[in-house]
């Protein structure tokens, strides 16, 4: 059981967390024909857009209600109305995801009433789904905003219908990359199941070149698929943060669910594969038996480099849980853990303590580590401390292929093992080289 600590300071120095609105927009981008709409100032949207564009290296559709000093005082209903009508006219979206920001949450705009009144005044948009997620960026973090968006989606769009025994809903949390979702989709379909991902950034943000420019997402989960979620026989929630959305589906449609908090490592993947076999009443495909043996061999090859290594992590709670459990299974020691927001998982972490803080806290705690794990904002810390840095999370600016990176399943687990193992090998070679140079030149 970990002790959760919060540093006693009134300012974030070198922040680790990203805003809830950014997380919600990421979730909305996993829907086809979507354009996320930020109800706030232009700067809020511009910052989120820059982060996502630099991370995925893709064109990201984001819109804003462009609140000013005057409209903030007088109220933002007119801005929302004009923004929605403009998007409908110029972009023809199939669905709009509306996110609040710290500015409009502080003012207290009643956005749900605004939307009702706008629909009453404009019956021509009555067919258009508009999903609202409350995402104040003065509290919580990316993971919270992502979860809030998914909960709003499953609360508003799915419709009741006849249960389809082969159909499963997969609620994919913010810890999973587009490459992760593609791997999970391949595994699930191999068992003869028909998955509906909510959301499916594996289809929309996987880095593909469309024939022409579009101001909305061209791939992802469709509105029709979202409406059919109520017909699923089972819900698979990937990440503890998706439990709330799974409960909503259980309450609305009496659909049972199971939460998988991790899909990296031999035992978690075994449990996932076994659950799919039971759910589908099909045997495990031979290719996954072979991949399992490959992972076992990879664990044998790499465990010499992992044993007793001290690792410090700065990640969102769901991702932190998954990596801590995986790294400990390989014999490493968790030297420090810093995260962004509260989660039921934090107290259950099998480490001494976890800090909800910023990168200043992380730099102080990570001294004498053998490896740092976190997003690209850790790069300067890694350089100052002369410690190798394994990039994980959002944003990653200084590496290519973030949309295709995979860390789940047997194959993804091997990718993580080899990636971290090679860093340990490079660090050891550099240490030996420095020792030899100092020995030859006589420096102590």
Swiss-Prot record:
Pathway of action: Cofactor biosynthesis; Fe-Mo cofactor biosynthesis
Keyword match NAD: no
Coiled coil segments of this chain: none
Alphabetized SUPFAM superfamilies for the sequence: Helical backbone' metal receptor
Any one GO BP annotation for this protein: nitrogen fixation
Keywords recorded for this protein, A-Z: Nitrogen fixation
GO molecular function, one term: nitrogenase activity
The keyword Cell cycle belongs to this UniProt entry's keyword annotation: no
Pfam family name, one: Oxidored_nitro
Family matches, as InterPro entries: ChlB/BchB/BchZ (IPR050152), Nase/OxRdtase_comp1 (IPR000510), Nase_comp1_CS (IPR000318), Nase_Mo-Fe_CF (IPR005975)
Similarity field: Belongs to the NifD/NifK/NifE/NifN family.
Function statement: This protein may play a role in the biosynthesis of the prosthetic group of nitrogenase (FeMo cofactor).
Protein's name according to its UniProt entry: Nitrogenase iron-molybdenum cofactor biosynthesis protein NifN
């Amino acid at each position: 059981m970990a002790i959760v600590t919060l540093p006693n300071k009134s300012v974030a120095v070198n922040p680790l967390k990203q805003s809830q609105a950014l997380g919600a927009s990421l979730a909305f981008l996993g829907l086809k024909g979507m354009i996320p709409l930020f109800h706030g100032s232009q700067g809020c949207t511009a910052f989120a857009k820059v982060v996502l564009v630099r991370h995925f290296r893709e064109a990201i559709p984001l819109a804003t209600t462009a609140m000013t000093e005057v409209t903030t005082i007088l109220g933002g209903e007119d801005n929302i109305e004009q923004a929605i009508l403009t998007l409908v006219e110029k972009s023809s979206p199939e669905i709009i995801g509306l996110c609040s920001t710290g500015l409009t949450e502080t003012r207290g705009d009643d956005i749900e009433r605004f939307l009702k009144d706008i629909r009453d005044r404009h019956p021509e948009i009555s067919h258009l789904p508009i999903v609202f997620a409350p995402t104040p960026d003065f509290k919580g973090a990316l993971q919270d905003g992502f979860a809030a968006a998914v909960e709003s989606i499953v609360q508003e769009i799915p419709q009741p219908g006849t249960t389809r025994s082969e159909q499963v809903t997969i609620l994919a949390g913010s810890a999973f990359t587009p490459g992760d979702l593609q791997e999970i989709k391949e595994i699930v379909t191999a068992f003869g199941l028909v998955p509906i991902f909510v959301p499916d950034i594996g289809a929309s943000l996987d880095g593909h070149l469309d024939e022409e420019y579009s101001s909305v997402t061209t791939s992802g989960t469709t509105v029709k698929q979202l409406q059919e979620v109520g017909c699923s026989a089972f819900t698979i929630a990937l990440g503890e943060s998706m439990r709330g959305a799974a409960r909503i589906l259980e309450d609305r449609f009496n659909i049972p669910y199971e939460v998988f908090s991790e899909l990296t490592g031999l035992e978690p993947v075994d449990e996932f594969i076994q659950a799919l076999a039971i759910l589908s009443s099909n045997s495990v495909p031979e290719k996954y038996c072979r991949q399992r043996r490959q992972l076992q061999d990879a664990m044998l090859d790499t465990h010499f480099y992992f044993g007793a290594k001290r690792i410090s992590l700065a990640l969102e709670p769901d991702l932190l849980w998954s990596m801590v459990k995986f790294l400990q299974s390989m014999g490493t020691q968790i030297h420090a853990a810093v995260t962004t927001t509260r989660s039921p998982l934090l107290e259950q972490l099998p480490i001494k303590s976890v800090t909800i803080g910023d990168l200043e806290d992380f730099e102080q705690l990570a001294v004498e580590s053998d490896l740092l794990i976190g997003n690209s904002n850790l790069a300067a810390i890694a350089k100052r401390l002369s410690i190798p840095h394994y990039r994980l999370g959002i944003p990653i600016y200084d590496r290519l292929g973030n949309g295709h990176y995979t860390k789940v399943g047997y194959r993804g687990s091997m990718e993580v093992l080899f990636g971290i193992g090679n860093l340990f090998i490079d660090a050891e070679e550099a240490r030996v080289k420095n020792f030899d140079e100092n020995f030859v030149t006589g420096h102590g």
